Design a protein with these regions (language model features):
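Non-catalytic C-terminal accessory modules of carbohydrate-active enzymes
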Residues: 198-201, 229-233, 246-247
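Aromatic-rich carbohydrate-recognition surfaces in CAZymes
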Residues: 1-77, 98-106, 189, 235-247
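Catalytic cores of carbohydrate-active enzymes
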Residues: 104-223
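Generic structural signal for residues positioned in beta-strands
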Residues: 26, 79-80, 177, 195
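Carbohydrate-binding/catalytic loop surfaces
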Residues: 2-23, 51-53, 57, 76-98, ...
């Protein structure tokens, strides 16, 4: 994904150390919204170039976006965090896992299965449903902390966003995306959103996490570089408020 400069079919490859785990998954928010607005289901069959070379249908671009994250997973089989997920301060690498991206992948798989069904592509729909069932099992086994969903798992196995870790126990993104993606069961949905209200809600909006980071190693969580209550260290982001509203 090239958000700032894009010459289709002519861009240099992104070096692996700069891969971001969330970038290609925003297609699953943007493209279905475009198709719903225009009514043009045929857009999924339109052939468009890749960033560097080659071309394929929009649907194939979506499949490739999913495969990118399915091919890069950590010790629990959840998506790798890579250079960053949406949170630029979170440095998880290839072995650390992003629960936020797991929810993005879940939404992507569910969307892909629905689109493939509507395009009369049963094999593609079945593939997505199988991957979805596998991911759901991993999410339920690894990511629920009792009252909310965890944030991430570091390369060394440290769990962030758990009641057992003293900082950043509750993370807004994983609560609201658990609901948006459909990963949360009904009891989980109700409880994690109650936790958002109890722990993150302020008169100015929902904070991104609570409590802020003060002692967590900076190599993994660069939010610790910011004052508590600012930016990714417990600040209030306009972008995340919209997700909370959707949830």
């Amino acid at each position: 994904i090239k958000p700032w400069l894009h010459k289709p079919g002519q861009m240099p490859l992104t070096p692996p150390e700069k891969y971001r785990s969330d970038d290609c998954l925003w297609f699953f928010n943007a493209i279905p919204a475009y198709v719903a607005e225009t009514g043009d289901l045929g857009f999924y069959r339109k052939v468009l170039p890749y960033s560097d070379a080659g071309e394929d249908t929009v649907l194939a671009h979506l499949r490739r976006a999913l495969q990118f994250n399915l091919d890069r997973t950590g010790r629990n089989g959840l998506p790798s965090g890579l250079a960053a997920d949406w949170n630029d301060c979170l440095k998880l690498g290839y072995r650390g896992e992003s629960v936020f991206v797991a929810f993005q992948v879940r939404l992507g798989l569910a969307t892909y299965a629905d689109v493939a069904h509507r395009l009369a592509l049963p094999d593609e729909a079945a593939w997505a449903q199988r991957e979805l069932a596998t991911l759901d099992e991993k999410i339920q086994r690894v990511c629920w902390d009792g009252d909310w969903f965890i944030w991430a798992i570091g390369e060394d196995g440290t769990v962030f966003g758990t009641h057992r870790y003293p900082e950043g126990q509750v993370y807004l993104n994983t609560q609201v995306w658990a609901v948006i993606s459909g990963a949360a069961t009904t009891p989980q949905r109700d409880r994690c959103l109650d936790t958002v209200r109890e722990r993150l809600a302020t008169e100015w909006g929902a904070a991104i996490c609570d409590p802020p980071f003060e002692k967590t190693p900076v190599a993994v969580m660069r939010a610790v570089l910011f004052n508590p209550g600012s930016k990714e260290n417990g600040g209030i982001f306009s972008h995340t408020q919209s997700w909370a509203v959707l949830a």
